Amino acid sequence: MTIKVVPLGAGQDVGRSCVIVTIGNKNIMFDCGMHMGMNDARRFPDFSYISKNGQFTKVIDCVIITHFHLDHCGALPFFTEMCGYDGPIYMTLPTKAICPILLEDYRKITVEKKGETNFFTAQMIKDCMKKVIPVNLHQTIKVDEELSIKAYYAGHVLGAAMFYAKVGDESVVYTGDYNMTPDRHLGSAWIDQVKPDVLITETTYATTIRDSKRGRERDFLKRIHECVEKGGKVLIPVFALGRVQELCILIDSYWEQMNLGHIPIYFSAGLAEKANLYYKLFINWTNQKIKQTFVKRNMFDFKHIKPFQSHLVDAPGAMVLFATPGMLHAGASLEVFKKWAPNELNMTIIPGYCVVGTVGNKLLTTGSDQQQQSKPQSQMVEIDKKTTIEVKCKIHNLSFSAHADAKGILQLIKMSNPRNVILVHGEKEKMGFLSQKIIKEMGVNCYYPANGVTIIIDTMKSIPIDISLNLLKRQILDYSYQYNNNNLNNFNNFNNLNNLNNNNNNNNNNSLKLIDIKNNTSTLFINNNNNNKKKQQSVVVVEESEENQDNNLIEEESFISSNNLLKKARLPISTIPIQGLMVSKQDQSSSSSNSNQLKLLGMNEVSKELSIKEIEMQYSLNLNFNNNTSDDNNNNNNNNNNNNNNNNNNNNNNNNNNNNNNNNNNNNNDNISLNFEFLTNELQRLLPIGINIERLEDSFFKPISLKIKSVSIQHISNMNIVVKWLHKDENLATHIISILKSIN
């Protein structure tokens, strides 16, 4: 099965977050935001990708909103009331309470002050919020019989949540915005190790590693103090809830310690009261310190911060003002900035990220922190198409953003342990850099699609099993007899891969074959130390196909490096691959295009992708035998090859080889070439290790074909089998079930 992901917004961009995820036959919309830097139709996601005829309710099974910031929820009334979506909408209770306030605030600015007409009304906001179903953290919600969702704490702002969505055995985690670092009023994001097929994560600060938070706080307070001491005014653009509470706690405490009560601090009228109310209502969403002190003292009852009245903008003397919105794209913060910017005594501190197109972004890209002289140079900044102002005030960007930095993003990936990662809500170049880091350091597939680009993820599952080695050998023999009407031990070795080409057109497509890898691979330096110049045999995956039937079946790309092998097999780095044998089975149930594929059977998988029509059994062996000297190895190899030519003497000679190996107790680390009989004799000496099934569901037992790949390994502590299931052959399913049931 597959999972499809297409961003309608926030694909290689920050703003109008909206991601459509298809799991099975279910379509989920994660977030429905607007772009704060756009003033035309581009401010909303392009919903025509979902349905050309507007049948959104039939297509979308549910909408999930992660938090109340407008770039994540701002288009929701437009989608429900103007586009006609009438299905379920999920968000946390704090998000449901705060969303309509911010939506109405923005609507007033857009419609009543700017005069725009194609916008939702106040009644539409109310009607939209009536459709919302609130969810609690860690509560599993059944959207329908197939789709379930679960919310996890995201930090970032009050009520922010990451969401885990599951359909059958396929799952996705969508993070929204999150913060892995606790602050003065919120905790850090946290999620179970849910091992989703896909993790969709924000990457606002994909290449940033933040410095000490305490150092940033000192810098913030120092700059404000220096400005107001000289009689200047400080403007701090913020959003109504979230970061501003953090900064208010900080500055209110500092004002008290420094006896600066004669210099007023203001907060946009009405917002302080509303913020206080919501933090009282949803105190359980704050951090432990806030909860513990709330009974004695409400930390949001600020002593030195007062409501701001519009006439105070022209008042003489020093002051500090927190004004909304945070990106200087409209509202009180922009109006005050126009008034204060031409005065070189004043200062504007931008504490967070500003999207492209906003005045805040223009200031950060042209003037931030370059004007730190006592007499800053002026610059001309375009406010809109009709207005340009001269900016003489100091501009500083001190990041107090509640987004995860690069370290936090990697931390969340490790915490959730996904199979694939998709990056959204970030800048393209930075996402590309982080993507390569994730692929290289974590070995996880990573994508960062643009808006409108669909990513398709193959979600075939694996079942790790520990199983008896003796039992495994018997079952392989049983399998070969059951499906090929012949015993495994009766097949001859192939000393030249060209023989496979010669047999392509014969009726051997369903036969089981032994392949002598020693005579059919080139040599590479594996696990090479500076003091070891000896070549070691490499094991390759070879495939025959109708498109490629030339004699040169083995190519450089087929080789697996030692490090990749050890990573795949989860082995210690000291493990050295040695030479062995493989067995192939060509399955009748494969499609015609794959009928000539060479299936490999052996000791451990090599790094080559499986198609969705295959089941993979992956296992490693603990041989624990002593190596011979180089001369003895050659003798053993010759004996083994002779044994292969004379099946009647196979077991005796191999047992002799086995005894010779056991009696030879030296520390030579040269590789040994082993045939299949010798390996199976070694297996028979090992005791069963039992079984430990991590996940096993009846729906998995519908496989089409069995593919077992191999690499001979020298030192492995235990055996791991991974079975990848598909859906068809009931006989093979029954056979595998019987194997599992027979293990004690």
From Swiss-Prot:
GO annotation, cellular component aspect: cytoplasm; INTAC complex; integrator complex; nucleus
Molecular function GO terms recorded: RNA endonuclease activity
One Pfam family in the UniProt entry: Lactamase_B_6
Coiled-coil features, chain-numbered ranges: none
Keyword Hydrolase: yes
Chain positions recorded as Zn(2+) 1 binding sites: H67, H69, H156, D177
Cofactors, names only: Zn(2+)
Residue ranges annotated as motif HXHXDH motif: 67-72
Compartments reported by the entry: Nucleus; Cytoplasm
Entry keyword set: Cytoplasm, Hydrolase, Metal-binding, Nucleus, Zinc
Region (Disordered) residue spans: 626-669
Subunit annotation: Component of the Integrator complex. The core complex associates with protein phosphatase 2A subunits, to form the Integrator-PP2A (INTAC) complex.
UniProt protein name: Integrator complex subunit 11 homolog
Organism: Dictyostelium discoideum
